[in-house]
Amino acid sequence: MIYWIFLGLAIATEIIGTLSMKYASISGGMTGHIVMYVMITASYVMLSMAVKRVALGVAYALWEGIGILFITLFSVLWFDEPISALKVLGLVTLIVGIMLVKSGTRKPRKQVTPRGDNHATA
């Protein structure tokens, strides 16, 4: 469970870091750059913690996919970036792809060793 929390934190810090990058580019101040560097670094640290137990393909798909969704949403709301029907279609396709990647990942089964069969044969 803690590894999924790490993944959630990685996603949140990636979103904050990327939005800070945009803010820094339009404001010209150093605050946005500092927040960006700290958040992007934290994002990678949290992602590296998450992939200890979450499958890499799933973690990366969620990290990037959910990040793109929220970054696009906040860019439209806060920075007045345009959004077209084609972008919306792309985001919907992204959501479907993330769901397929997540549902296609299975936990490996534990191998059960029969009792009394632990000796080597020649």
From Swiss-Prot:
- Topology within the bilayer: Multi-pass membrane protein
Q: Please name the GO terms that the record assigns under molecular function.
A: amino-acid betaine transmembrane transporter activity; antiporter activity; choline transmembrane transporter activity; spermidine transmembrane transporter activity
Question: Where does the record place it?
Answer: Cell inner membrane
State the Gene Ontology BP annotations.
glycine betaine transport
**Where is it mainly found?**
membrane
Classification via InterPro entries: Small_drug/metabolite_transptr, Small_multidrug_res, Spermidine_export_MdtJ
Q: Which Pfam families match?
A: Multi_Drug_Res
Its Gene Ontology cellular component terms are:
plasma membrane
Q: Which residues cross the membrane?
A: 1-21, 31-51, 54-74, 81-101
* Transmembrane helix among keywords: yes
What are the UniProt keywords, alphabetically? Cell inner membrane, Cell membrane, Membrane, Transmembrane, Transmembrane helix, Transport
What is this protein for, i.e. what is its function?
Catalyzes the excretion of spermidine.
Enumerate the HAMAP family for this protein: MdtJ
Could you give the subunit structure recorded for this chain? Forms a complex with MdtI.
The UniProt entry's sequence similarity note says: Belongs to the drug/metabolite transporter (DMT) superfamily. Small multidrug resistance (SMR) (TC 2.A.7.1) family. MdtJ subfamily.
The cross-references to PANTHER family, in alphabetical order and at most eight, read: SMR FAMILY PROTON-DEPENDENT DRUG EFFLUX TRANSPORTER SUGE, SPERMIDINE EXPORT PROTEIN MDTJ
* The protein, known as: Spermidine export protein MdtJ
